[in-house]
Amino acid sequence: MAEAFNDKRLTGSKAERYAQVAEEIAAVLAGEPNPTARMATVAAMLAATFEHYFWTGFYVVDPDKPDELVVGPYQGTLGCLRIPFGRGVCGAAAASRQTQLVADVHAFPGHIACDSRSASEIVVPVFAPDGRLIAVFDVDSETPAAFDAVDADGLAAILSQAFGRPS
């Protein structure tokens, strides 16, 4: 059994905290092949580390409807159950296979308001080692413009490490 995660040990700049939690996540995930367990762990550890995270979790590509995302492991209030590719911030990330960094979600065309308290959002695509899109990782904040390139780079590195595709 892994040592209990203590987010209070993580200090320094945001970039340093991403690097520290990446090491912690890698240690906890070592030897665990199950993608659901890996997703649940990543979501929980990141939510515990960053105070500006309001909702943190995965939307997984539905194998029965490959142009649709279905809610996966997350931390936070009730998530939207399904999101079509191309709709909202998560759907845009899935369709474009590119990170979406949104300072004001209310100004984003087609934004899906799963929780009206969300003000800004970052969504990072998650790829299998063979390059297939398997999910998107969604983080919302109640603070406008809460995310920047440091978050995008830190999350991309953690997700690449956890799910096998180099960034």
Where are these regions (language model features)?
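Sensory-domain boundary capping and coupling elements
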Residues: F127-S141
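A short acidic/glycine-rich loop-to-helix N-cap element
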Residues: P144-D151
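A short, aliphatic-rich beta-strand micro-motif
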Residues: S120-A128
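Interdomain signal-transducing alpha-helices
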Residues: A93, R97, G131, D151-P166
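Intrinsically disordered, low-complexity terminal regulatory regions
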Residues: M1-L78, A157-S167
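Short loop/turn motifs at secondary-structure junctions and domain boundaries
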Residues: F50, C114-S118
